[in-house]
């Protein structure tokens, strides 16, 4: 699959946590080398589930994705940034104005120096 992505993809979506990303990126880089592609031309995206249990009910499948604070989410985003992830897609629960406000706070913290 990585070889197909290396040859044809404009972007590759993975599901690895930040700590596993370096190993997975190395495998992708090797696949790029095999097909003569510069690995820098194949950005990686990840889906990230973020759940704030203090703001409402969380679906069972997201129980392990809970975050205690906006700072914790900002730290998670920083870890993906350090790992070289180009784009994060967020699934936020509960889907409420309060959760969106906390996500906005996390993004502001992530972007601050």
Give names to the regions the model predicted:
Residues 1-113:
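Active-site-adjacent structural elements that line small-molecule/cofactor binding pockets in enzymes
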């Amino acid at each position: 699959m990585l070889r197909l992505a290396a040859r044809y993809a404009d972007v590759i979506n993975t599901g690895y946590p930040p700590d596993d990303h370096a190993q997975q990126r190395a495998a992708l880089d090797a696949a790029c080398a095999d097909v003569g592609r510069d690995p820098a031309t194949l950005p990686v995206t990840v889906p990230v589930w973020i759940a704030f249990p203090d703001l409402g009910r969380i679906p069972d499948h997201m129980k392990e994705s809970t975050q205690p604070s906006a700072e914790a989410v900002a730290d998670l985003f920083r870890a993906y940034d350090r790992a070289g992830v180009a784009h994060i897609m967020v699934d936020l629960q509960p889907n409420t104005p309060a959760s969106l406000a906390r996500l906005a706070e996390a993004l502001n913290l992530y972007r601050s120096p």
